[in-house]
Amino acid sequence: MTLTIKPSEIFGSIYIQMSKSDAHRALIASSLAKTPSIIKRWIDNVSVDVEVTKNAVSNFADLEIIDDNLKVFPKKEYKKELVIDVKESGSSLRFLIPIMSAFGITCTFTGSKKLFSRPIDVYKKIWKEEGLEFIHSEDSIKISGQLKASNFKVLGNLSSQFLSGLLFALPLLDGNSNIIIDGELESEPYVMMTLKTLKAANIETLRHDNNIIEVYGNQEYSGIDYEVESDWSHAAFFAAAGALGGETTLYGLNKYSIQGDKEILNILKFMGASVSYNDDNSITIKKTNRLNALDIDMSDIPDLGPIITTLAATAKGRTRLYNAGRLRYKESDRMNDLMDSFSRIGANIEVSEDEILIEGVERLKGGNTTSHNDHRIAMALAVASAVSDNDIIIDDAESINKSSFNFIEQFRSIGAKVVS
């Protein structure tokens, strides 16, 4: 699908959809429980990735949507051999692999070749050391065998999803386990989200300093009464649209959330945008003057990389995104693909091994570009229409559905001139 977005002034308000990250975790914890759960503020068909996890956990629980709530009823029996299509969802794959092995399920994960080219060696190494089967091909992964309690080493700077997957699975094992974090942990807010969900399900863990998490075995998940937060990662695109194109007011967000991507508001303030908290708990972001460049540590906020690139593309001065190397292992090689996608529409970007340097121009020229089939790059390019002299034409824009089925509709509602 190709999207054409004409230069647009932005003004309006929207309610931010439920958090993809929070929804993944709530689905998994509730499906592992011994008693029924209720997940509040549920929006069905919010994104491809959440639907992947929802379909997968239906192997362990029956799911029923009543009004705005998802009720989860655990099954007493489950199949010992499964095939699960994870499409392009790295979160689903990395969360589910340890859980399947905790139950001793033989499982074949299918999906896009692009997904199976992303890093998975953390699990492959552990499964080999534990004597379990782990067969990795270009379009699938097959695992079999019973995971047992042990000490598991995880690289801190690769993806927190490996750590979260183990955190979900290890309480089900017979005996205590330790997760040893090798190096400094990046994306820690995502780990904190997992621990928060586990606590809601009465699962106990103990963190020893910053590098060891002890997970007690022989635990049972309790049913949860859980309200899914709105998505700060998704809100960042609309916040940036307001800062560049006029004004946006965002509803539904928890300003005390542990989601790391709420940092977007601090970034916008430091760059010179107006950010105000309203009495009705909404947040308004207004364009002031041209934004200012900034040095930004990307360690805990890699998913903000694309939209920060949009902000920096026309900021005054040079923006430096450092500790950005993990962007190479997302839905695309985001460092090189961001450089390519934004250079095509007039941005001045350079990348090195661990940094992205963006020298701001006054306006983007627009033109034809591509998302590289990366949902966050596609949405970031769409927002760039607010500072473009000409239409921005995005190839592979269907990738947006990976994280949001209604982004285009909401973007139009605040003034964006989108042509499908």
Curated annotation (Swiss-Prot):
Domain of life of the organism encoding this protein: Bacteria
UniProtKB keywords: Amino-acid biosynthesis, Aromatic amino acid biosynthesis, Cytoplasm, Transferase
The species this protein was found in: Brachyspira hyodysenteriae (strain ATCC 49526 / WA1)
Catalysed reactions, semicolon-separated: 3-phosphoshikimate + phosphoenolpyruvate = 5-O-(1-carboxyvinyl)-3-phosphoshikimate + phosphate
Molecular functions per Gene Ontology: 3-phosphoshikimate 1-carboxyvinyltransferase activity
Binding-site residues, 3-phosphoshikimate: K20, S21, R25, S159, S160, Q161, S187, D303, K330
Stored PROSITE patterns: EPSP_SYNTHASE_2
Main location: cytoplasm
Presence of keyword Transmembrane: no
Subcellular location: Cytoplasm
Annotated catalytic residues: D303
Role this protein plays: Catalyzes the transfer of the enolpyruvyl moiety of phosphoenolpyruvate (PEP) to the 5-hydroxyl of shikimate-3-phosphate (S3P) to produce enolpyruvyl shikimate-3-phosphate and inorganic phosphate.
CC per GO annotation: cytoplasm
Stated name of the protein: 3-phosphoshikimate 1-carboxyvinyltransferase
Binding site for phosphoenolpyruvate: K20, G90, R118, Q161, R334, R376, K402
Quaternary structure note: Monomer.
NCBIfam families documented for this protein: aroA (TIGR01356)
Enzyme Commission designation: 2.5.1.19
Family: Belongs to the EPSP synthase family.
SUPFAM superfamilies: EPT/RTPC-like
This protein's encoding gene: aroA
